[in-house]
């Protein structure tokens, strides 16, 4: 079936009785993912987690015990120093790291692959905060984002194709290859081994798990390179 079995939005999670008065952040997604897997133990299973990540106000993206970097920016009035703003942002990244570790731990004994990427970066310099600057003037911090592919040992060993894909990803990591969101569609399907009889449906040049992958960005700018 191409229809989702279920979906939840943040407001629905917040309204649940067991969450009354509780902080609702990205970590709350993990139990829902675990529950979904338990309810569908056999067959192919796709779970999409839409996180808040490190969106402003950064101090609202992590609990107090993750405030490792101080002083932290706690207000939205624009009066925070650059150092405090960066500290709050770093704390939010630290919390996301812990969420990803928890996510991976839930999947280590399964044949699983995880794709993670941010939709944009954030500017933290004076008078140039946040994102959505027009592309022609956007600083690198706004368009250079993390892109992660994680595979469990069971997934890698499931077949030679997965092993080859993993080696290709490690190769690109070692080369510090410049990748972009343009690769997400073909990479997700390609790493999963999806094939299509339609020639134009999948582009191996955009598939990070393929040896045919080619970068679409220069290393120093956000200028796209469109091959003929």
Where are these regions (language model features)?
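Catalytic cores of PAPS-dependent sulfotransferases
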Residues: 38-39, 103-116, 122, 151-156, ...
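C-terminal, low-complexity/hydrophilic appendages and adjacent surface loops
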Residues: 225-228
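Active-site-proximal alpha/beta segments of enzymes that process anionic O-linked groups
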Residues: 1-74, 144, 180-181, 186-194, ...
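A long, amphipathic alpha-helix that forms part
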Residues: 31-35, 72-117, 143, 148-150, ...
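Short glycine/proline- and charge-enriched loop/turn segments
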Residues: 8-17, 67, 128-134, 163-170
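A short beta-strand-to-alpha-helix junction
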Residues: 83-96, 135-145, 156-188, 198-203
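Beta-strand elements within well-structured catalytic alpha/beta cores of enzymes
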Residues: 45-51, 100, 112-121, 147-148, ...
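Histidine-centered active-site microenvironments of extracellular/periplasmic hydrolases
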Residues: 112, 117-161, 202, 217-220
